[in-house]
A protein has these predicted regions:
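Glycine-rich, small-residue loops and helix-cap segments
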Residues: 19, 67, 161, 340-472
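Residue-level signal for inorganic ion chemistry
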Residues: 30, 52, 217, 248, ...
Length: 472
């Protein structure tokens, strides 16, 4: 174990400013961590070690994170580094410019060491692809950590880095943190700096760091949020809990697609009791979205996005999509299936998703916060399904069932977080609690997260396959 393993990014930055070690020395420590843990857990796609070494001692010590190394999810443009999205089709893709969000990350004083594993183009619920392989859960390597920020979550949970970047378009900053025992935040839509090459904001996807501590996440949030005031004024740096007591709506199951595992339900009920002991008011309430209708609408939405990808892959290969060899069988067959969806049905799907905004706005006229499972299951077995399978209605339902509590939140534009407050006795895997607030109420969630972190600390609860127990 290296002596810095228990430090979060904020603590490391303080020690860098105190000159206990140099930025270059810290880079070498983190590189050794990667070299020890990645062969066992497979969380990396690309390394940027030489880039990080060259930048190390050029980062100002008065920058908030002062040169602390991090990893970025392999689904965002970083100038000069490969961006593969976990796909053969993207292996030669090297963006020339960093997007605005990445520029803010580096201005905050982070030093990028490399990129983390994802399912191909975030198209499946298990972090696995046919280029880099499957990412294993450090709590139980026979299991996955969901997706798509799986590599980043594993790197943090294994103690390799105190923070790693994630994107969340359907649950990706909540599902992997739930299964790895770390903190994951999905900010409100358009809250953060743009992560898109055109400078716009995706309708569903947003960016934020995954972390062991709330204070790391809150500081990173303040340094990468949009300062434009459109559509929300900046939140700023949130440093602790609020005295405000909240009215919380509790959901443990919705009766659709798949029943919530008893361990997951019981975990949320115990967290509800914790909230009541802290003075919050909790009552059970129905989940406001029909999971079957959501699954249908999301499939239609996906169908409206993939036509250009099909054209590009066929042009690059000179072959029909299924024969191109550039996409996994799962994604290619999913795209082919989606091609049959009519423009009228795509429009109907988008209308359903757009209507989630008023649906959740109505819910938050009654409640300050919703508490729900992150997923109805603890975690999927590592190879329960693989990228070489053909898309089917069964697989579509499998994915939709595991996204049913997270994906509607992206289209509603609400902030949400996974907080590590429970563990599975059967599997030894963490079970996150999913807190959701009204659009723009990111501060409220951070204040609640600080309170929960104080009431039930998780920072020093380590995975068995982590650097806490592995010599470096």
């Amino acid at each position: 174990m290296d002596e810095l393993i228990d430090e979060d990014a904020t603590g490391l930055a303080e020690r860098l400013r105190a000159r206990e070690f140099t930025q270059a020395e810290l880079v070498e420590t983190f590189i050794r961590r990667i070299e020890v843990m990645n062969p066992a857990l497979n969380f990396m796609t690309n390394s940027a070690f030489d880039r990080a070494r060259s930048k190390a001692d050029t980062i100002p010590l008065d920058a908030p994170f002062a040169g602390v190394p991090i990893l970025m999810k392999d689904m965002i443009d970083i100038g000069g580094l490969p961006r593969t999205d976990g796909s053969r089709f993207m292996l030669k893709n090297v963006p020339e410019r960093s997007v605005e969000y990445v520029e803010a990350v580096e201005a905050a004083g982070f030093n990028i060491l490399g990129q983390t594993n994802v399912p191909e183009m975030a198209s499946f619920i298990i972090t696995n692809n046919d280029v880099f392989g499957a990412t294993k859960n450090p709590w139980n390597p026979d299991y996955s950590v969901f997706s798509s920020s799986g590599g980043s979550a594993v790197a943090v949970a294994a103690g390799v880095v105190p923070m790693a970047h994630g994107t969340d378009g359907a649950g990706s900053n909540r599902l992997p943190p739930s299964a790895t025992g770390i903190f994951g935040m999905k900010p409100s839509r358009r809250r953060m700096r743009s992560g898109e090459a055109d400078g716009r904001h995706d309708v569903a996807k947003t960016n934020q760091m995954l972390s062991r501590t709330v204070r790391d996440s809150a500081l990173a949030f303040s340094l990468t949020e949009s300062l434009s005031g459109d559509p929300f004024p900046p939140v700023g740096h949130i440093t602790g809990p609020s005295d405000r007591r909240l009215k919380v709506g509790l959901i443990v199951d919705d009766g659709k697609l798949i029943a919530t595992d008893p361990e997951v339900s019981e975990a949320q009920r115990k967290v509800a009791l914790l909230l009541e002991n802290l003075g919050h008011e909790v009552e059970e309430t129905p989940w406001p979205v029909d999971a079957n209708e959501m699954a249908d609408a999301y499939a239609k939405f996906f169908g409206g996005k993939v036509g250009a990808l099909k054209t590009a892959v066929e042009a690059a290969s000179g072959k029909p999509l299924m024969e191109s060899g550039l996409l996994t069988r799962f994604l290619a067959s999913n795209i082919e299936s989606s091609a049959a969806i009519s423009p009228e049905d795509i429009a109907k799907g988008r209308t359903f998703l757009d209507e989630l905004v008023p649906v959740f706005a109505d819910v938050f006229r009654k409640y300050d916060v919703l508490l729900a499972p992150v997923a109805p299951v603890v975690a999927p077995p590592l190879y329960e399904h693989t990228p070489d399978e053909l898309f089917s209605d069964e697989l579509s339902q499998y994915v939709a069932a595991r996204l049913k509590f997270t994906s509607p939140i992206n289209f509603a534009g609400c902030p949400a977080m996974s907080v590590p407050l429970s563990w599975s006795a059967d599997l030894g895997i963490p079970i996150g609690s999913h807190f959701i607030a009204a659009e723009g109420q990111d501060r409220l969630l951070y204040e609640l997260a600080y309170e929960l972190e104080e009431a039930r600390p998780w920072r020093n609860i380590w995975a068995p396959f982590s650097l806490k127990y592995v010599p470096v």
